[in-house]
Amino acid sequence: MKLRVYLSLFSALAILTVSTGCIISHCTTPAAGGAPAAAVRPGLEQELKKDVLYLAKTCHPRPAGYEKNQARAVQYIARSLSESGAAVTYQPFTADKRTFVNVSAVFPGKSAKRVIVGAHYDTCGSTPGADDNASGVAGLLALGRMLKGISPHDTIELIAYANEEPPYFGTEQMGSAQHAQKLYTEQIGVKAMICLEMIGYFSDRENSQSYPAAGMGALYPDKGDFIAIVGNWDSVRLARTVQKNMQSFLPTVRLNLPEIKGMCMDFSDHRNFWAKDLPAVMITDTSFFRNPNYHQPGDLPETLDYRRMAQVVRGRDLGLVLKRLQRYDLFFIRQNFSAFFLHFTCFFFEFG
């Protein structure tokens, strides 16, 4: 009897160990390193810097309520996206009796189902918002230039959002919440959503990177020299696809977890697509877990690393992410991970 109990306990421990390893592998991939960074398109760094400077200087400040500066930003974004050959439209909506605008650029594909890339253009208060989030918008505009003349399989929508920052964060007045609801109401299929949220701040200093939970430092680097891909359970395959393309350009880490309060997993526009059970990931330099200038007057264009920012955007190869998404069923992981736990539970109780 004791032998059977010991064998059961030993087997359960072994299964738990293997399961833990599978879960860790499922949730995270350590930073990719060792290979030299691949080259990016000449001139990309300068284009990114030009866009950041315009948004953070000419349009400063651009929070909700600063209508003239937000209008400048909207016009600049729309003009740049129009030059890419996309069909550009404004998506106005009302919050607190004021009108706000999302700027949408659609590249029609053979399939009506959409791959969406979004970035918010507003700032928190009177901060310059170079990293948060002129960097993300600059990446969005660069992607528009890369897609010029391309005939995609899936319809691609690039969209610049209003109202990501307070006082509208977490409300239905976020531009991305309005957009997600519009897609739902119009029954437009969404294959994936990629959110560009702060992609320009990097550090090679030791202990320059922090994390939302104790123990995460054992899995992730202590230097802020990587880009992160953040997703929930439904977005594992999407996150892996994005990481696969990006890791030849710079170190990347991936985190896929349930939406746990306090983990800061949903601190941008992708949250509103998760709320609709759509696969979405955030590409980020990890915000205040690395950048000391977050929501501060020091969030200036000169603090950004445009070389590594260009590697995030990666010239032509960010377009490859969109192409590779055509080959995947993005709900595969959700179904199979549920099956994994079902099989584990049945095996445990059967053996015990």
Q: What annotation goes with each model-predicted range?
A:
Residues M1-I15:
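N-terminal Sec-pathway targeting helices
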Residues C22-R72, S84, D122, F289-D299:
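N-terminal capping segment at the start of a domain
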Residues A35-P42, T58-K68, Q91-T94, T123-N133, ...:
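Second-shell loop/turn segments in exported
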Residues G43, E47-K50, Y54, K68, ...:
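Extracytoplasmic/secreted proteins, especially bacterial periplasmic and envelope-associated proteins
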Residues L53-K110, R254-N256:
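A non-catalytic alpha/beta surface segment that caps or lines the substrate-entry region
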Residues C124-R237, M265:
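Acidic/histidine-rich catalytic neighborhood of metal-dependent amide-processing enzymes
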Residues A192, D204-R327:
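Active-site-adjacent substrate-binding region
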